[in-house]
Amino acid sequence: MKIPLFFLIPALIIGGACTPKSKDNTAHIRTVVDSVGFAKYDWQMDSIMRRLNYTSDNENTWRVVVTPHDDYAYVGDLYPKILNGVKAKTIILFGVAHKARNFNLENKIIFDSFDAWSAPYGNVKVSDIRDDIVFSLPDSLYTIHNEIHSVEHSLEALIPFLQYQNREIEIIPVLVPYMSYDKMQEISELIVKRLKQIMDKNGLSWGKDIALVITTDAVHYGDEDWGGKNYAPYGTDSIGTLNARNHELEIIDSCLTGVVSEQKIRKFINYTVQENDYREYKWTWCGRYSVPFGLLTAYKLDAVTEKKGLSGTFIAYSTSIDNPALNVEDFNMGTTAPANNHHWVGYAAVAYK
């Protein structure tokens, strides 16, 4: 999550998924909202990967990953480290709905109705599987809301890295707003039921053909520039920062790594969400809904497909103050938030196969 810094964009018509193109047969494209923190052009992406000394040497094929979505300058090589194991052509993206409160959205997953999303190497097609899933869900469990997708940065951060290694990717963007655990269970069950039917009908393999990418930034920590809120329960000196980091690693180790289970997913929720109000933070991970919803979907999908259990591997953890920011200014990019002991963000990367 970033400090409030958004660019004005044209209002977009909120269309149904059953209307893929406008009357003039022009494709409906979702444009990039954050061209400061993320790459918009191919030359920017090529330059970033060169500066990161990227080599595509990951022999693993991940079925699911949990990845950050903050400025490239801060997250750095954590992006390719986690995303280069995503080999599937069709990728279901579970993102954060940072502005859900502004649109009074909760307890429904949020789809878009765009034909494609703008990306550095050309528009990325939205998979036809999206509409198939949407049509299978009761109206009460989803909404199609292009406006919130158009101002949300959590998914567009990932697409350039995914597209860099596979120009043919197709995506299914999903935002997860405030949501109770019971509602997560209900919706994920129905999504998995339909997804299983689609995979069987088309001979699609999980990992090879379809993958799930879940995004969250980890703790948003500090006592400055958080909209007047204090997110530093351990303090902001060196000891407080160390304790906050240790708390982060405890969450990752006990909830996100090893064999995935409903108990671990519930435990993650208990770490991050207030027990008496699921809308409120306990520990400030912006993906306090996208992570459990995405992992529940993965857990249930494994139960009806692979049936061998899903296991999470810790890839890395870093923060926006661990290392000097990657220099991106010569690429006409920058940062959208400060990074110091009074304002920093954590980044967790976990992969599942």
Each PLM stretch: what is its role?
Residues 1-4:
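Positively charged n-region of N-terminal signal peptides that target proteins for export
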Residues 8, 12-24:
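Bacterial Sec-dependent signal peptides at the C-terminal "C-region" and cleavage site
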Residues 8-9, 88, 280, 339:
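Exposed boundary/loop context
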Residues 10-11, 106, 298, 305:
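Amphipathic, positively biased hydrophobic alpha-helical segments used for protein targeting
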Residues 20-292, 296, 300, 317-325:
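Active-site histidine-anchored catalytic micro-motif
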Residues 300-353:
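Long, Lys/Arg- and hydrophobic-enriched amphipathic alpha-helices
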